[in-house]
Swiss-Prot record:
<feature type="binding site">
    <location>
        <position position="181"/>
    </location>
    <ligand>
        <name>[4Fe-4S] cluster</name>
    </ligand>
</feature>
<keyword id="KW-0808">Transferase</keyword>
<dbReference type="InterPro" id="IPR006638">
    <property type="entry name" value="Elp3/MiaA/NifB-like_rSAM"/>
</dbReference>
<feature type="binding site">
    <location>
        <position position="184"/>
    </location>
    <ligand>
        <name>[4Fe-4S] cluster</name>
    </ligand>
</feature>
<keyword id="KW-0479">Metal-binding</keyword>
<keyword id="KW-0004">4Fe-4S</keyword>
<keyword id="KW-0949">S-adenosyl-L-methionine</keyword>
<keyword id="KW-0411">Iron-sulfur</keyword>
<dbReference type="InterPro" id="IPR007197">
    <property type="entry name" value="rSAM"/>
</dbReference>
<feature type="binding site">
    <location>
        <position position="177"/>
    </location>
    <ligand>
        <name>[4Fe-4S] cluster</name>
    </ligand>
</feature>
<feature type="domain" description="Radical SAM core">
    <location>
        <begin position="163"/>
        <end position="390"/>
    </location>
</feature>
<keyword id="KW-0408">Iron</keyword>
<dbReference type="InterPro" id="IPR023404">
    <property type="entry name" value="rSAM_horseshoe"/>
</dbReference>
<dbReference type="InterPro" id="IPR023979">
    <property type="entry name" value="CHP04014_B12-bd/rSAM"/>
</dbReference>
<dbReference type="GO" id="GO:0051539">
    <property type="term" value="F:4 iron, 4 sulfur cluster binding"/>
</dbReference>
<dbReference type="InterPro" id="IPR020612">
    <property type="entry name" value="Methylthiotransferase_CS"/>
</dbReference>
<dbReference type="GO" id="GO:0046872">
    <property type="term" value="F:metal ion binding"/>
</dbReference>
Length: 449
């Protein structure tokens, strides 16, 4: 691999589709700290691409691999710049480099966490890089995981215009997850050991984002209360983190939304009430204990309801995320989820059709069953049959409408809201079918992993 010229003479562009992800900003900051000329964009900019020596496509969804605009941009760069511009893919999609290298005309895939390896790869090293050598695919996995001490991220000038669930940015406080959820990639990508940043480093970063114009900040590492976790929850460190960040940005501009029901208690919820906007987002997923067991959630219906009640008793608002059309979900399981929503009276609800992400158990399950048994490919024959929905789309649509009626503050189901939810279900179905079709193309490869 040819070594690229060094330092400020090297023009690097990082492209993060639609959203400036934290990972893209982080790698941008590390490369800038090393003296490189770095641009971070969230829209395809062919003029900038043609002036770049290195372009990193920081992708966070399997859907990006299929994105026509991304494919065309990569082909355009390779056609015009030949070998003058190196094109890499990075991000959480890097756990399946074989698919990327077969689908996209790129020089390589930066595998896993890229803080240590990305600067080395730009200098010509191959550690942490997957690439094609003739007809063979070579995958060099990183030798070590980075600690989380790093320079400030590269913060875009228009960061205040970005909104991710109401926040301008999600700042990472820790990595890793103790869970075993079958649909989640986090333990595979970041590991099961919790690695946490120093409170002071997080605070300095929040100050930098505030100076750059960010008004609303969320902090997360998958499950907020696992910050500084060793053998048990470190409440003192978690409270210190919330208090100090809140002092900088203000409690009405800080959220720590992502929580597991088995890692909250009254003290943690009181801290969330006192130092943040006062919301938690629980990944509830299903009202069926059988499905929760199939998903390896480590919780059940009763624990979920108890955690919701506890939060409400503490004056904290609760949003719940649900997954429909999990491969083993029956009609009865789905009805139990509807019953759960009635009992829970959540303040907000998010509904997703089960998405197979490569390297997860859910992906293996989807690829191991005939497509015609997948609810994404079965036509709905019930009350919405005139809408031409798959069974998965119908459950998504139905649950969105049902949840709206049973929220703590329900909205009337206007034609506009009806069409909004119908469109949401259709888009999810279309996208996840496209992903599933792609994964079936690599079925044998993925089931071997």
């Amino acid at each position: 691999m040819n070594k690229i010229k060094e330092g400020a003479n090297v023009r690097i562009t990082i492209y993060s589709p639609e959203v400036y992800t934290y990972g893209a900003m982080l790698i941008g900051g590390i490369l800038k700290h090393k003296g490189y000329n770095v641009h971070l964009v969230r829209k395809i900019d062919k003029t900038l691409f043609l002036k770049s020596d290195v372009i990193i496509f920081s992708l966070y969804s399997t859907l990006h691999i299929l994105d026509k605009n991304i494919r065309e941009a990569i082909d355009f760069i390779k056609k015009v710049r030949k070998n003058k511009t190196k094109v890499y893919v990075a991000g959480c999609v890097s756990t399946y480099p074989e698919i990327i290298l077969n689908e996209l005309n790129v020089d390589g895939v930066i595998v896993g966490e890229g803080e240590i390896t990305t600067p080395k790869i730009i200098e010509g090293d191959k550690e942490g890089l997957a690439y094609k050598e003739g007809d063979e695919i070579v995958i060099n996995y990183p030798k070590e995981k980075p600690d989380l001490n790093h320079p400030l991220p590269l913060i875009p000038k228009d960061i205040e215009q970005q909104s991710i669930r109401g926040a301008n940015v999600y700042i990472e406080t820790h990595r890793g997850c103790l869970g075993n959820c079958t649909f989640c990639q986090v333990p595979k990508f970041f590991g099961k050991t919790i690695r946490s940043r120093d409170v002071e480093d997080v605070v300095e970063e929040v100050k930098a984002f505030k100076r750059a114009g960010a008004k609303r900040i969320a902090i997360s590492g998958g499950t907020g209360s696992l910050y500084a976790f060793k053998k048990s929850i470190n409440r003192d460190k978690f409270f210190e983190l919330l208090e100090k960040v809140s002092e900088v940005i203000g409690k009405n501009n800080l959220s720590v939304p992502d929580m597991r029901v088995d890692y909250v208690d009254e003290e943690i919820l009181e801290a969330i009430k006192n130092y943040t906007i006062g919301w938690v987002f629980y990944g509830i997923e299903s009202g069926s204990d059988k499905i929760l067991k199939d998903m390896k959630k480590g919780t059940n219906r009763e624990k979920n309801l108890d955690a919701i009640k506890l939060a409400k008793d503490c004056g904290v608002k609760v949003a719940g995320s649900f997954i429909v059309a999990y491969p083993t979900e029956t009609e009865m399981d789905y009805l139990l989820t509807k019953d759960f929503i009635v009992d829970a009276e959540l303040d907000d609800v998010f509904v997703s059709i089960a998405e197979p992400i490569p390297t997860t158990e859910l992906c293996d399950l989807v690829l191991s069953m005939p497509k015609e048994e997948n609810l994404l490919y079965k036509m709905h024959e019930g009350e919405y049959r005139k809408l031409g929905l798959s069974e998965a789309e119908a459950r998504c649509f139905d649950l969105l409408i049902h949840a709206e009626m049973w929220k703590s503050m329900p909205k009337p189901l206007t034609p506009q809201l009806y069409n909004l939810y119908l469109n949401e279900a259709r888009i999810q179905g279309k996208d996840i079918r496209a992903i599933t079709d792609l994964l079936f193309k690599y079925r044998d490869l993925l089931l071997k992993k």
